[in-house]
Amino acid sequence: MKRSERIDRVELMRTFVRIVEAGSLSAAARQLSTTQATVSRRLQSLETMLGVRLILRTTHTTRLTDDGERCYQHARRVIDSWLALEDEVGQTEDEPVGVLRVRAPHAFGQDQLLKPVTEFLQRYPQLSIEWMLNDRSADFLGDNLDCAIRVGVEVDPATVSVLLAEVPRSVVASPALLARFPAVTTPEDLQQFPWIAISSFYQRHVELFHDASPATARIAITPRLSTDSLYVARNTALTGLGVAVVSSWTVQDDIQEGRLVHLLPEWQPAALPVHLVYPWSRYYPARLRRFLELMRQVMPEVTGMRKPV
């Protein structure tokens, strides 16, 4: 009976931690794949067991009490220790099990990364992955994520960020658009064109770097279209709507087959860094550790990537 009670207490603490990190009982219930009534009942059981109120609830908000804040800090440590014990006793320290929740950018997530992720799952039959595609910054607690693949320089200093690779970029335009303007011979000539902006990376200016000298050029642009989608930028560039800066791998075939022109190839936008990002923790399960190893190994070899300079 005592063993059963201990397991129940761990489950109650897990539920409490999830309520705090998800921000509400309803969000915690969704992440735990249970009902809000069950989550509420577990919270009440933990409060009764401890003899204190942990969370103050109103119609619209939940707030930790002072006792709740102390309980959360202790419960977080207990859960981390319990997970480490389960790995060690269950002899799964090196064998990924359970569910790994990963957020990846739309472009990479539905294209280049699928093959290594599929092979990773075939290698570890007890592992499942929730592969969520989104270009926004990751909300690890609110969305119950284990890690995220981020493209770009903005990284939250409160997280662990591992540099995996970088993505070269190119300035491109359609032949039809170029035919309407004087020839492009300098970076300044690009200012005469309409542009397609990728709002995550550039909106009003584009900075270019000369590949054979320390020279740089900062170009003011006027976007006809702003988007957060790499594919939208590439596809609208093909229509002749404007000039775009895109990841080189997305337009390699278009350039080779003449659908797009690579402008000023000696002037390049800075390559975008690719990071694997995850929250700080005292304990990382085998599924996250193995996934990090996989990404470190395969990311620089993925089409369109290169090792960081």
Regions found by a protein language model. Name each.
Residues 59-62, 66-69, 80-103:
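Short helix-loop hinge/linker segments at domain boundaries
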Residues 47-64, 260:
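A short LG(V/I)-centered, amphipathic sequence patch enriched
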Residues 17-33:
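Short helix-boundary/capping micro-motifs
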Residues 97-160, 308-309:
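Central regulatory/effector-binding core of bacterial HTH transcription factors
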Residues 22, 31, 45-53, 123:
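Residue cluster at the C-terminal edge of the helix-turn-helix DNA-binding motif
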Residues 138-142, 154-274, 301-309:
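C-terminal regulatory
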Residues 36-37, 110:
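The DNA-contacting recognition helix of HTH DNA-binding domains
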